[in-house]
A protein has these predicted regions:
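Active-site loop segments of alpha/beta catalytic cores
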Residues: 1-26, 30, 106, 127-385
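Residue-level preference for well-ordered alpha-helical positions
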Residues: 36-37, 97, 305
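Intrinsically disordered, low-complexity N-terminal regions enriched in serine/proline/glycine
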Residues: 42-43, 55, 66, 95, ...
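Segments that shape or occlude catalytic/ligand-binding pockets
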Residues: 18-76
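Glycine-rich, aromatic-flanked loop segments that form ligand/cofactor-binding clefts
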Residues: 4-9, 43-55, 71-121, 145-184, ...
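Generic detection of intrinsically disordered/low-complexity segments and helix-coil linkers/edges
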Residues: 6, 20, 37-38, 50, ...
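Compositionally biased, low-complexity repeat tracts
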Residues: 16, 59-61, 67, 76, ...
Length: 385
């Protein structure tokens, strides 16, 4: 057996294919998977493809945190709501008309964002702007119907084949409160609103529970083996008491539905995790993905391993994005960093080597190839570096 290695290269690929700067050995229209084959290791199929949409329906509801992209196991349907879409240059204004009022949001996807490899539009105007908006957004979610879409997932799974784990996307937020934080308000405004309008926020969470319940049931019954729920956990933004009180109960609830069915819960833990290390083992998650160590965060992989071992949580990640940038690490520094990382990974159990969070657009491509060589050379399990 060998240490699993699944590098995330979508941001790098999107940017370089858009700019026409893919490495010379690849033809102009080489696919992401063709380049992944060249690098070696497994396919990274965790965060979904938000760019190659089948129709505008796939991501038009980005402003309310609802997606219908490839690889998902469910499809959300707006009920009793009229959606009006208006293009304004590089922005898209989306208005939701309900019997009790209307709300709107604005999505921005610029040429610079495309050149930078960004795959998800930026929410430049959030859906909650005043206290009355809470009830309107609550109406949207309380009446939303969620339908199984297992054929969509199975098509995705077939395309991945045996080259990686086809993770199905559940939701980018781990709970209703986390959903409000990530999609309905900017982070600063969210905390002001928690203080200024706790009743409205609590009622909105209650209105969103049926939506999460529907998703959880469908995910638990899905053919997927690994389910993605929740991203961007961070000790500052989702500080420990917030994570414990407002996110963990929903992670534990879904985990309790998945584990009896032999399924695993994956969370995208790409932030500063130091303050959350004691909570993650209790959260129900089986895989902490995009775990990022020093120098981009305050933790070492050794510290993360020691903490997460208590909950038998698998670590997925370890190579920080800056390790691929020549202006951040020289070749000599890169070699030193990677050798030290392999020493920390020993003996290699419950570890999937990956990029935290993703390979940057200006990465030195040869370093991806070099890591694959290191895995071949030093990754035999149990590792004895």
């Amino acid at each position: 057996d060998q240490l699993p290695w699944a590098p995330r290269i979508d941001l790098w690929y999107n940017s370089n294919s858009m700019r026409g700067t893919l490495p010379p050995k690849f033809r102009k229209h080489a696919t992401l998977d063709e380049i992944a084959d060249d690098i070696g290791g497994a396919y990274y199929k965790v965060v979904p493809d938000f760019i190659n949409v089948r129709s505008y329906e796939d991501n038009i509801d980005r402003g309310i945190g609802v997606y219908r992209v490839q690889g998902m196991s469910y499809k959300a349907e707006l009920v009793g709501v009229e959606r009006v879409v208006k293009k304004e240059g590089e922005a898209t204004l989306v208005t939701y008309l309900t019997p009790i009022g209307s709300v709107s949001c604005k999505l921005l996807y610029t040429e610079d964002m495309k050149q930078g490899g960004v795959s998800i539009p930026w929410i430049s105007e959030h859906v909650i702007k005043e206290p009355n908006d809470y009830k309107t957004v609550g109406y949207i979610f309380k009446n939303m119907k969620v339908h199984p879409d297992y054929s969509n997932y199975l098509d995705f799974q077939r395309n991945v084949g045996d080259k990686g784990i086809a993770v199905t996307f559940g939701n980018s937020a781990g709970s209703p409160m986390h959903h409000i934080m990530k999609d309905f308000l900017d982070a600063t405004t969210f905390y002001y609103e928690m203080y200024d309008h706790p009743k409205e926020m609590r009622e909105l969470c209650e209105d969103m529970e049926p939506y999460f319940d529907q998703i959880f049931r469908i995910l638990a019954d899905s053919p997927a083996e690994v389910i993605f729920l929740g991203a961007n956990y961070d000790e500052m933004i989702t500080y420990p008491p917030f994570f414990r009180d407002h996110i963990m109960p929903h992670l534990q609830k879904l985990a309790g539905m998945l584990h009896p069915r032999g399924k695993l819960l994956l969370c995208h833990c790409d932030g500063e995790n130091k303050g959350l290390l004691d909570l993650i083992p209790e959260s129900g998650m089986d895989i902490a993905e995009a775990v990022c160590p020093q120098p981009m965060t305050k933790v070492t992989i050794s510290e993360v391993k020691k903490a997460l071992k208590k909950g038998k949580v698998t670590i997925f990640g370890g190579v920080p994005s800056v390790a691929f940038l020549e202006d951040s690490m020289s070749d000599e520094e890169f070699e030193h960093f990677m050798k030290n990382l392999f020493r920390e990974i020993v003996p290699g159990d419950r570890f999937i080597l990956g990029v935290s969070d993703t390979t940057p657009p200006d990465a030195k491509f040869e370093r991806l190839l070099r890591i694959n060589e290191m895995v071949q050379q030093w990754g035999q399990l149990p590792m004895k570096f």
